[in-house]
Amino acid sequence: MSVTYFISDLHLSADRQDISECLFRFLENEAIHADALYILGDLFEVWIGDDDISPFSESVASALKTLSLSVPIYFIHGNRDFAIRQAFADKAGMTILPEQHVIDLYGRRALLMHGDELCTRDIEYQKFRKKSRGWWWPRLMLMLPLKTRQKIAKNGRETSKNNQKQLTADIMDVTQSEVELAMQHHDVDLLIHGHTHRPAVHEFTVLERRMTRIVLGDWYDQGSILIAGQEGLALENRVF
């Protein structure tokens, strides 16, 4: 049976071995039989550069590389791991895709993205996103010593947590008009994304065209997977 898997928002870190162990089981037992695996951002809790090598990141790269020998792996940057560059992608056997990418999913055009660009009501975050995805800011950051980047990342995570406490759930969710604009721009009726940690299937109509938006779940409490095949699409969980 032909299937394609989509995952996002794993937020892998060395202090959450239960998440990485669940991922490794999924790669070894399920993804190995797939046509392809798409990772739609936030694979890691934080990524400050491909030079931040650790036994943990190496174990993740090794597991992905093993899968890539049989199954193509595609990756779209998230807001936590936008600093992943070609060096790590090569080590992990991943192909880096543009921020918004259209694929043929068993005869249906599907738009893939991490999804943070759709949350336009979070104005402060969008300002940061524009800066951090520009050409100069990432280059400047990657020129800093590794320890300096580690301190900046730690402070940034603490600031982000404090800011999120002050934001309403509505602000942190996608803006429907942005969803519709993106889908119309790419001429698709299926959008798959992550970021919001609110797994669901949303159906709506735009100009008499039926649209579907599928939101992938996070991996904090269980693995969250979208399975796509000729028979349809299904969101499923995997226990730790």
Question: Which residue stretches match the model-derived regions?
Answer:
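Short, Lys/Arg-enriched, disordered terminal segments
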Residues: M1-S2, F240
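Residue-level marker for buried hydrophobic side chains located in beta-strands
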Residues: T4-F6, L37-I39, L111, I192
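N-terminal short leaders/motifs
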Residues: L43-L67, K165-L191
